[in-house]
Amino acid sequence: MLGSPLREYELLVSLGSEFEPEAESRVRSLFTPVEPEGVTVKHLDVLGIRKFAYEIKGRNDGVCVVVRFLANAGSIAEIGRQMRLTEDVIRTKLLRVGRK
C-alpha cells in the first residue's frame, strides 16, 4: 500500500531490563527495514525500567520505550512482524494518534 496516506502512530515497546543501556538503538533498529517504505520516526523516548502490573513472559519489569512515527497502513504489518521476530521485545502496544 505505497499509495496510502501517512498517518501518525504511537508505539510502546517493552524490552528486557538488561537492555536498558542500548534500548534506544535496539528499538531504532526495528524500524530500519521499513524506512524505504516511507516510515519516519518523529520522536523516541526511553522511559526507563518500569515494573509490570503482572508477569509477562516470566518477567516482572522491563525497559519501556515510546516511539511516535509516521507510516502508511501497509507498513504497520511489517513493523508488527519485526516486533514479533525480535526476542528482546517483551510486549508492544500500537495506537493510531488522532483517531476517535
Swiss-Prot record:
GO terms for cellular component: ribonucleoprotein complex; ribosome. Pfam families: Ribosomal_S6. InterPro entries: Ribosomal_bS6, Ribosomal_bS6_sf, Ribosomal_S6_plastid/chlpt, Transl_elong_EF1B/ribsomal_bS6. GO terms for molecular function: rRNA binding; structural constituent of ribosome. Gene3D superfamilies: 3.30.70.60. Transmembrane segments: none annotated. Keywords: Ribonucleoprotein, Ribosomal protein, RNA-binding, rRNA-binding. GO terms for biological process: translation. It comes from the Bacteria. Belongs to the bacterial ribosomal protein bS6 family. Binds together with bS18 to 16S ribosomal RNA. This is Small ribosomal subunit protein bS6.
